[in-house]
């Protein structure tokens, strides 16, 4: 993993940054080895490599995330990596759930919203049009409810964590027009 990190330049994106799964050869390619952040990961972060969650159905491990965050390697962007195979994976039903996991890790509502909106837009050089509600922007909005109360989270390695709050999607607005129905189900805490 260190060899790969050393090749990344400022602005390059390392997604699945907190993965706990091995690669196709069976080697673990985590930025954390034996509880310690790889020096190459911190060096990449310091030179401007973007660290993206990319949760998906197999790429988020609490033990990797907690160690990396504690040792100074915070995520820049939150993405779900949702696709046909990951959408029904335990622990990863939708983007707001991934955002909620990071609130449970100590990030504020403002931080997780920025990591899922304005920061990704900046990474792909699409500000102020994307990730913004400025005049002239497309008017794409995800309306969420902050639900307080005990909630259980699980990662893709079946590590469990308890939280006190989660985000529930309520309505989507695309190009200024409400899209679909207001969400009631299946977005319920299980």
Question: Where are the model-predicted features located?
Answer:
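Histidine/acidic residue-rich metal-binding segments in metalloenzymes
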Residues: 1-51, 59-76
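His/Asp/Glu-enriched, well-ordered alpha-helical/loop segment
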Residues: 61-146
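Residue-level marker of alpha-helix boundaries and capping positions
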Residues: 31, 55-56, 89-90
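C-terminal cap of metal-dependent C-N hydrolases
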Residues: 138-190
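P-loop/Walker A phosphate-binding loop and immediately adjacent motor/lid segment at beta-alpha junctions
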Residues: 30-53, 98-105, 156-178
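Active-site metal-binding loops of divalent metal-dependent hydrolases
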Residues: 19, 56, 82
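Glycine/Thr-rich phosphate-binding loops of Rossmann-like dinucleotide-binding domains
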Residues: 23-24, 88, 152, 182
């Amino acid at each position: 993993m260190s060899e790969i990190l050393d090749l990344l330049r400022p602005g390059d994106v390392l997604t699945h940054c907190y993965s706990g799964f091995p690669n196709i050869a069976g080697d673990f390619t985590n930025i954390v080895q034996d509880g310690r952040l790889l020096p190459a990961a911190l060096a990449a972060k310091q030179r401007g490599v973007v660290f993206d969650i990319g949760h998906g159905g197999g790429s988020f491990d609490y033990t990797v995330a907690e160690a990396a965050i504690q040792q100074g390697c915070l995520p820049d962007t939150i993405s779900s990596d949702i696709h046909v195979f990951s959408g029904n994976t335990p622990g990863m039903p939708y983007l707001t759930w991934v955002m909620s996991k990071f609130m449970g890790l100590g990030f504020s509502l403002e931080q997780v919203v920025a990591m899922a909106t304005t920061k990704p837009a900046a990474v792909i050089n699409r500000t102020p049009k994307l990730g913004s509600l400025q005049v002239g922007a497309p008017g794409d909005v995800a309306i969420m409810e902050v639900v307080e109360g005990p909630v259980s989270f699980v990662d893709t390695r079946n590590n469990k964590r308890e939280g006190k709050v989660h985000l529930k999607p309520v309505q989507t607005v695309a190009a200024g027009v409400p899209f679909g129905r207001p969400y009631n189900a299946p977005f319920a805490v299980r």
